């Protein structure tokens, strides 16, 4: 019976880590879904890359990866998000 709280805690930690939007390498589609968006505009100098969430996710999102490796979910319709995506695409082409 004492192992149940530990197992529950491990499951909760796993679910929360999925929430952060961990992505797969070499793909433009994130491995997991976002459940909430960041409410702050990230400084451009922090941004390294981006990915889109899967179409099967309940909320469409863009997951930005910072230069420190943090994953941040953002609303795709936001103007700053669209601008950052365009800038990152330009960098990839040059």
UniProtKB/Swiss-Prot annotation:
Any GO molecular function: CCR chemokine receptor binding
SUPFAM superfamilies with a match to the protein in the record: Interleukin 8-like chemokines
Location in the cell: Secreted
Pfam families: IL8
Keywords, comma-separated and alphabetical: Chemotaxis, Cytokine, Disulfide bond, Inflammatory response, Secreted, Signal
Major location category of this protein: secreted
PROSITE patterns hit by this protein: SMALL_CYTOKINES_CC
Highest taxon above the source species: Eukaryota
GO cellular component entries: extracellular space
An example Gene Ontology biological process: positive regulation of endothelial cell proliferation
Secretion signal, residue range per the UniProt entry: 1-23
Intrachain S-S bonds: 33-57, 34-73
InterPro entries: Chemokine_b/g/d (IPR039809), Chemokine_CC_CS (IPR000827), Chemokine_IL8-like_dom (IPR001811), Interleukin_8-like_sf (IPR036048)
Gene3D superfamilies assigned: 2.40.50.40
Keyword Oxidoreductase part of the UniProt annotation: no
Family per record: Belongs to the intercrine beta (chemokine CC) family.
Function as written in the Swiss-Prot or TrEMBL entry: Chemoattractant for eosinophils and basophils. Acts as a ligand for C-C chemokine receptor CCR3 which triggers Ca(2+) mobilization in eosinophils. Also acts as a ligand for CX3C chemokine receptor CX3CR1, inducing cell chemotaxis.
Record text on subunit structure and interactions: Monomer.
Name this protein carries in UniProt: C-C motif chemokine 26
Species the sequence originates in: Canis lupus familiaris (Dog)
Record lineage: Eukaryota, Metazoa, Chordata, Craniata, Vertebrata
Gene of this entry: CCL26
């Amino acid at each position: 019976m004492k192992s149940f709280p530990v197992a529950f805690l491990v499951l909760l930690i796993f679910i929360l880590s999925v929430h952060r939007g961990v992505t797969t390498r070499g793909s433009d589609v994130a491995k997991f879904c976002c459940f909430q968006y960041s409410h702050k505009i990230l400084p451009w100098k922090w941004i390294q890359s981006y990915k889109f969430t899967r179409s099967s996710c309940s909320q469409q999102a863009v997951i930005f990866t910072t230069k420190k490796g943090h994953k941040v979910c953002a609303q795709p319709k936001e103007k700053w998000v669209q601008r950052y995506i365009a800038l990152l695409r330009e960098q990839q082409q040059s």
